Amino acid sequence: MATDYTVGDLVAEFLSACGVTTVFGIASVHNIPMLDAIGRRNSIRFMMARGELGGAHMADGYARVSQGLGVIFSSTGPGAANAIGGLFEARFAGSPVLHITGQTSTRYADRAMGSVHDPYDQLGMMGSVCKGAYRVRSAQNALGVLTQAAVEALSAPMGPVSVEVPIDLQRVKIERPAVLDNFVLPLAAPRVPTDAELDELAARVVAARRPLLWLGNGAKQAGGAAAKLLDMG
């Protein structure tokens, strides 16, 4: 069946299905098909940054405020490298950021043939600061890779994850996945403490002379409960 739906369209629709309404970054020759698809859908606002570093910080800030997925688009090679400082901060802060970067055509990637902005081990570079770094290696596995990356970013401990989408694959026409009709990220439900664990914790707090409440990134969604505990004195 003929279709005009591309991997770039898949990226745009996937982000919408994840609840993303704003993305940040820099337009380049290696990510234009994805950004064009976002423009055609007209459901996600693209905020152009002055540079990839700023775009990564913007995505980090968006994730912190929205308590959802922050997204930055960059070019390949130097463009992806420029985002590293912001992604490192997102990793340190536990912010769920999805970094989507272009990559040179699959026939040239990793072959050191001098293709435009063909970086040496870009996956290794991004993996050094992110929770994970992945490449879309075929049009058929694009949705799976994006889903894995988003779930990893949003799973405790949250943090940035990078995905490469080679420029030739961005333009490949595919059948629209029917699963996107009612798509929900397969996030694991937070662990609920048992009554016995809660009783033990309560006993320790009551017995403590000067209790200290030290909350980490895993308690980001528990602000109300933490405030209630503090108010109990």
Language model regions located:
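N-terminal alpha/beta PP-like core and its mobile active-site loop of ThDP/TPP-dependent enzymes
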Residues: M1-G233
